[in-house]
């Protein structure tokens, strides 16, 4: 009888692990045990993955002061900067257009960058790409409070930089949507 229970236990464990593997392979992001969110970034035109961006609480002197955004990206244009934003919708379809506009839960209708509380909450620091086409430099997004509030949105990287203003061009002048990752519920 003991062998029967061991066999049943092993079978159940196999089913659970297989289900977990299936779920993680089909999610656009992963939730780590240490309170991290890993967003898989893809080219909006080719749908080819260019790496991941990890989002985790930024703790300084024992207090949370926003979220730490750590890119692990490759095959990007060398020596460039790119506007980075949280967009409203959890979709990267239609060349990134389905992501909607910048996440603005307070309806400020202002693009003032990541350090001004009077603008879009989805305004993040720019992404800097190294000479070898990788982006690995972490940045802090002080307006973001939790991983949970990011669920149901998307993370977007634009073709150009971001001047954190609506002038001379709206939304920081970042231009076309280039790389996107869904942050699903």
UniProtKB/Swiss-Prot annotation:
Cofactor: Cu cation; Zn(2+)
Disulfide bridge positions per record: 92-180
Binding site for Cu cation: 85, 87, 102, 158
Record's GO cellular component terms: periplasmic space
Coiled coil: none
Annotated signal sequence range: 1-18
Reaction(s) catalysed (UniProt annotation): 2 superoxide + 2 H(+) = H2O2 + O2
Subcellular locations according to the entry: Periplasm
Residues binding Zn(2+), per UniProt: 102, 111, 120, 123
EC number: 1.15.1.1
Record's keyword annotation contains Protein biosynthesis: no
A Pfam match: Sod_Cu
Gene Ontology MF annotations: copper ion binding; superoxide dismutase activity
Subunit annotation: Homodimer.
Function: Destroys radicals which are normally produced within the cells and which are toxic to biological systems.
Record protein name field: Superoxide dismutase [Cu-Zn]
Source organism of this protein record: Francisella tularensis subsp. holarctica (strain LVS)
Classification of source organism: Bacteria, Pseudomonadati, Pseudomonadota, Gammaproteobacteria, Thiotrichales
């Amino acid at each position: 009888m003991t062998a029967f229970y061991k066999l049943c236990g092993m079978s159940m464990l196999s089913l659970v692990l297989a289900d977990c593997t299936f779920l993680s392979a089909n999610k656009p992001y992963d939730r780590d045990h240490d309170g991290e969110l890993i967003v898989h970034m893809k080219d909006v035109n080719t749908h080819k993955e260019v790496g991941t961006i990890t989002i985790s609480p930024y703790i300084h002197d024992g207090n949370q002061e926003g979220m730490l955004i750590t890119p692990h990206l490759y095959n990007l244009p060398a020596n460039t900067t790119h506007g980075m934003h949280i967009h409203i919708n959890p979709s990267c379809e239609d060349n990134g257009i389905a992501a909607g506009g910048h996440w603005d839960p307070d309806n400020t209708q202002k693009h003032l960058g990541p350090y001004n509380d009077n603008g879009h909450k989805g305004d993040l620091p720019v992404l800097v790409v190294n000479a070898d086409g990788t982006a690995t430099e972490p940045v802090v997004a002080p307006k973001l409070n939790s991983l949970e509030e990011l669920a149901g949105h998307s993370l977007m990287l634009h073709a150009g930089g971001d001047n954190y203003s609506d002038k001379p061009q709206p939304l920081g002048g970042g231009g076309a949507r280039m790389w996107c990752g869904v942050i699903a519920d």
